[in-house]
């Protein structure tokens, strides 16, 4: 299955709690942290919910 590189580019401080949980669910911990996640509908949903804090490649 394909993977997607996701990087956290903005702080989670003061954000909507559900968006913070989506970032945590993707495995991101700090600004500049990059992870590769499987390109599944579940992960795409989390990315779409918090897109304004992320950079997505692939």
Curated annotation (Swiss-Prot):
Q: What is one GO biological process annotated to this record?
A: translation
What InterPro entries does this protein map onto? Ribo_uL30_ferredoxin-like_sf, Ribosomal_uL30_bac-type, Ribosomal_uL30_ferredoxin-like
Q: Which gene encodes it?
A: rpmD
Name the UniProt record assigns to this protein = Large ribosomal subunit protein uL30
Which cellular component appears as one GO term in the record?
large ribosomal subunit
Q: Does the keyword Membrane apply?
A: no
One MF term in the entry's GO annotations: structural constituent of ribosome
Entry keyword set: Ribonucleoprotein, Ribosomal protein
> What's the subunit arrangement here?
Part of the 50S ribosomal subunit.
Homology family: Belongs to the universal ribosomal protein uL30 family.
């Amino acid at each position: 299955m394909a993977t997607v590189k996701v990087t956290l580019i903005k702080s989670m401080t003061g954000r909507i709690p559900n968006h913070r949980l989506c970032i945590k669910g993707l495995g991101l911990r700090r600004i500049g942290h990059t992870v590769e996640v499987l390109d599944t509908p579940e992960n795409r949903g989390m990315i779409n919910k918090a897109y304004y804090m992320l950079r997505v490649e692939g």
